[in-house]
Amino acid sequence: MSDPIKTALSLVPMVIEQTNRGERAYDIFSRLLKERIIFINGPVEDGMAMLVCAQLLFLEAENPKKEISLYINSPGGVVTSGMAIYDTMQFIRPPVSTLCMGQAASMGSLLLTAGAKGHRFTLPNARIMVHQPSGGFQGQASDIERHAQDIIKMKQRLNEIYVQHTGQNYDVIERTLDRDHFMTAEEAKQFGLVDDVIQYRAETEKEEKD
């Protein structure tokens, strides 16, 4: 069975832009990158993390003060890959605005709440899910024990990150993330994962004057 994400990417539309040097063709994601929009779509893994981090660093180099928009529709994925994106978001100078469309689950929810304070949004019918990290190991008993200790440390670190960005106390975060916990957009706002639920794009000053 073919990968639906790869199938979708093979059908990415091209857009034509008129410039004083003539016409130039972009795939739609490259054109949106010019507008400082980055997509996290699908499972979070090393390949995606590499591309997202590279785009964040490029946009910082292009303009270290202008906001970057991160659109998220992800079921989550590899913790270390997600942490690479998270650390890069915190490391760069431009503020990163996040918006959930569809779902932000597991590492997707952590990246959603990691946006700049006051700039974390979700669309009204999006779904957010938080839980503790999971993993499976095999091998010698001593190695399994070390892996178990490591995942417990990772769980504690993830809990601390959620505490930092939501304002909830540690016990609430630990209890909420103990099992898969699904939230509506409004519930995610009340919990502190996002700052607002938006249904319509706000008008720009130019549109208001027109």
Swiss-Prot record:
It is found in: Cytoplasm. InterPro entries: ClpP, ClpP/crotonase-like_dom_sf, ClpP/TepA, ClpP_His_AS, ClpP_Ser_AS. It is an enzyme of class 3 (hydrolase). It catalyses: Hydrolysis of proteins to small peptides in the presence of ATP and magnesium. alpha-casein is the usual test substrate. In the absence of ATP, only oligopeptides shorter than five residues are hydrolyzed (such as succinyl-Leu-Tyr-|-NHMec, and Leu-Tyr-Leu-|-Tyr-Trp, in which cleavage of the -Tyr-|-Leu- and -Tyr-|-Trp bonds also occurs). Keywords: Cytoplasm, Hydrolase, Protease, Serine protease. The lineage of its organism: Bacteria, Pseudomonadati, Pseudomonadota, Alphaproteobacteria, Hyphomicrobiales. This is ATP-dependent Clp protease proteolytic subunit. Pfam families: CLP_protease. Fourteen ClpP subunits assemble into 2 heptameric rings which stack back to back to give a disk-like structure with a central cavity, resembling the structure of eukaryotic proteasomes. The gene is clpP. Belongs to the peptidase S14 family. PANTHER family: ATP-DEPENDENT CLP PROTEASE PROTEOLYTIC SUBUNIT. Cleaves peptides in various proteins in a process that requires ATP hydrolysis. Has a chymotrypsin-like activity. Plays a major role in the degradation of misfolded proteins. One of its GO terms (molecular function) is ATP-dependent peptidase activity.
